[in-house]
A protein has these predicted regions:
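Intrinsically disordered, low-complexity polar/charged tails and linkers
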Residues: 4-34, 49
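Small-residue-enriched alpha-helical segments and adjacent helix-cap loops
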Residues: 9-13, 37-171, 175-179, 187
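Short beta-strand elements
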Residues: 25-28, 163-167, 228-237
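Short, flexible, solvent-exposed loop/turn segments with mixed acidic/basic and small polar residues
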Residues: 26-31, 62-68, 236-237
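Short, solvent-exposed beta-strand edge segments and adjacent coil->beta transition regions
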Residues: 34-36, 71-73, 197-199, 244-245
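Beta-rich nucleic-acid/ligand-interaction surfaces
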Residues: 152-154, 204-208
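Iron-sulfur cluster-binding cysteine motifs and their immediate structural context
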Residues: 183-201, 208, 212-228
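A hydrophobic, small-residue-rich beta->alpha segment in the mid-to-C-terminal subdomain
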Residues: 227-229, 234-261
Length: 261
């Protein structure tokens, strides 16, 4: 009986379009007729419902474990060829969808941004979702990666991505609110802020738009709307190159997505 089934599975395998399966997130394993499914996990965000369904599918169709990828993704290995359609259907019930592989736009990575992190200057996850809606799965000559990080701490290593987006604070001093305490000068790590005759002086050539001055100010004497620093052409595969930031500070989402396009 077991031998007969494996024979049927081999016949099925001969008719499979592996390129299409890979495009849909199912990667062939070294074990015959086994696949590892890469899920689309935007910005590393999964709900309890997602996690429950992933666990159920891994137990039912895999070998009971999942792999967390280097780009915040989840892979379910040891899925049999015959179960692929059922796996997709059951994952969809839990709000999960397959990712993509090959030469196309991959899942967007992101930190938690200013919704959770005290250092965050932007809502990283919101930007990641919008990027995913615009570009996910788009066919390109080579795999393409977006990364969104909320501030200069750069937890997501923005410059490692083909397009990296880093949250910034477009800081402006508000003299009327300032008490001349000098806290912002001490908070500034780049030496962009100095106190001169009890007043703040900012050298914007030194400013990296981290926003520490605004966050440290006890009297809210800084205006610090969200902004973006974008980098291009970062690669960290077989060849390594740091993404470059040729554009000035981007001050709104419309400009940001125009730059991404």
């Amino acid at each position: 009986m077991n031998s007969a089934w494996h024979g049927n599975e081999d016949i099925m395998a001969e008719k499979v379009d592996y390129g299409t399966l890979k495009k849909g997130g199912f990667m062939r394993q070294k074990q015959k007729n086994n696949f590892s499914l890469r899920l689309a996990v935007v910005g590393g965000y999964l709900t309890a419902e997602n996690l429950t369904k992933i666990a159920e599918v891994a137990e039912k169709y895999g070998d009971g474990h999942v792999h967390l990828t280097s780009r915040q993704g989840v892979e379910i290995p040891f899925i049999k060829l015959k179960d692929i359609d059922a796996v997709k259907e059951e994952l969809a019930e839990g709000g999960c969808r397959p990712g993509v592989c090959g030469p196309r736009v991959r899942t967007v990575t992101a930190c938690q941004g200013n919704t959770i992190c005290p250092s965050g200057n932007i809502d990283s996850y919101d930007i990641a979702v919008k990027l995913d809606e615009r570009y996910f799965g788009r066919e390109l000559p080579h795999k393409f990666k977006f990364g969104v990080t909320g501030c200069q701490n750069n937890c997501l290593k923005a410059e490692e991505n083909d397009v990296g987006i880093k949250g910034a604070a477009d800081v402006k001093w508000i003299e009327d609110k300032c008490i001349g305490c000098g806290v912002c000068e001490k908070a500034c790590r780049t030496g962009a802020i100095t106190m001169q005759d009890g007043k703040v002086a900012v050298d914007y050539d030194k400013c990296n738009y981290c926003g520490r001055c605004a966050k440290s100010c006890p009297t809210d004497a800084w205006d610090a709307p969200s902004a973006y620093i974008i980098s291009f052409a970062g690669t960290f595969g077989n060849s390594i190159s740091k993404g470059e930031s040729p554009l000035p500070l981007i001050r709104n989402e419309e400009q940001l997505f125009r730059a991404c396009d």
